[in-house]
């Protein structure tokens, strides 16, 4: 089922008697053609408890650079694998993903568990720009707020100065974090947005 798909390894973190250890939870494959998508869905993975996990949590907890950024800037919570990959490529190692645009109680409990090991000042919800992402961001914010998390939702309509130009809205062609260039993401970080 993963043949000819772009594969992401999903890892978790578990405690053993000697500290935190990474654990491979599954492999998820993204369809690369419409035929694949129609046959087996856009994403296919071996069974795992997705509702209990946060993608890229292992880096947040075990990688010193990611840990430092998480302590300083907080968590950037996105929808998916490609969003995390683009943010990390741009140097934002404090990115994680819900693997969707909603959050389960199990994922909230996972964030509580992460917060007990890594202090972070806030969570920035950087979900997709589409209606599902915007609605999801508001619902996720509400649920996280009720669990004591300081949460900010990324404002897709904000004015930003890219390349020293006059501030203007983020182009409509950018629909999610993965659509941004490395330079655009780095500009947002320099402006203190995340």
Which functions belong to the PLM regions below?
Residues 1-119, 137:
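Phosphate-handling DNA/RNA-contact segment within nucleic-acid enzymes
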Residues 35-37, 72-73, 81-194:
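TOPRIM fold recognition
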């Amino acid at each position: 089922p993963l043949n000819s798909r772009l594969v992401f390894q999903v890892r978790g973190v578990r405690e053993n008697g000697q500290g935190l250890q990474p654990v491979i939870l599954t492999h998820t494959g993204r369809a690369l053609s419409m035929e694949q998508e129609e046959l087996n869905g856009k994403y296919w993975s071996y069974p795992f408890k997705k509702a209990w996990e946060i993608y890229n949590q292992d880096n947040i907890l075990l990688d010193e650079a990611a840990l430092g950024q998480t302590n300083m800037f907080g968590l950037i919570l996105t929808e998916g694998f490609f969003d995390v990959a683009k943010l990390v490529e741009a140097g934002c190692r404090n990115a994680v993903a819900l693997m969707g645009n909603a959050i389960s109680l199990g994922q909230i409990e996972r964030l509580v568990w992460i917060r007990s090991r890594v202090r972070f000042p806030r969570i920035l919800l950087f979900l997709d720009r589409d209606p599902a992402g915007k609605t999801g961001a508001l619902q996720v914010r509400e649920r996280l707020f009720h669990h004591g998390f300081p949460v900010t939702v990324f404002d897709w309509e904000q004015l930003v100065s890219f390349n020293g130009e006059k501030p203007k809205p983020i182009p409509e062609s950018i629909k999610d974090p993965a659509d941004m260039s490395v330079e655009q993401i780095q500009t947002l970080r320099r402006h203190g947005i995340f």
